[in-house]
Amino acid sequence: SLKGGQHMADTVLNTTVFDGATKLITHYNVVSDNSGSTTKIVDVSTLASNNGKTCKTVRLNKVSFNVSVTAPADAIRMQWDADTDVVFQSLAGEMEYDYSSFGGLKNTEATGFTGDVNVVLPACTAGDTGTIVCEWIKVYES
């Protein structure tokens, strides 16, 4: 039972499907209770290294999603983590984007960037849902 001031949170499933030498696959699913949420879907500090090199950032190579939000303004936002996060993709509806022809969307490396990626679902309507599957290209320190 919920007590005064407490509220449930969005129900989030956030998994790494594959973490290879050059490719990373992530799967994110959310069912909102209307409180909104921010989820780190890529944490570069936890990714497998390659020949002793650490992953510095990722590029969004492909994304497929099914986002059902009541209000269009509540689209899910994908953000490069930085001192001031940079929104690089907004997701609403059901679609696929393939950026592989030019090497993927690259991190803008804004001030204080971490290389991580956040997904933000604004406070929205209870029952709004989203599923996002991403293929990332791992970029290593030189």
Segments from the language model and where they lie:
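An anionic, turn-rich surface loop/hairpin at beta-sheet edges
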Residues: 85-106
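Short loop/turn segments at connectors of secondary-structure elements within structured domains
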Residues: 12, 70-74, 113, 126-128
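Short, Lys/Arg-enriched N-terminal segments with co-localized hydrophobic residues
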Residues: 1-7
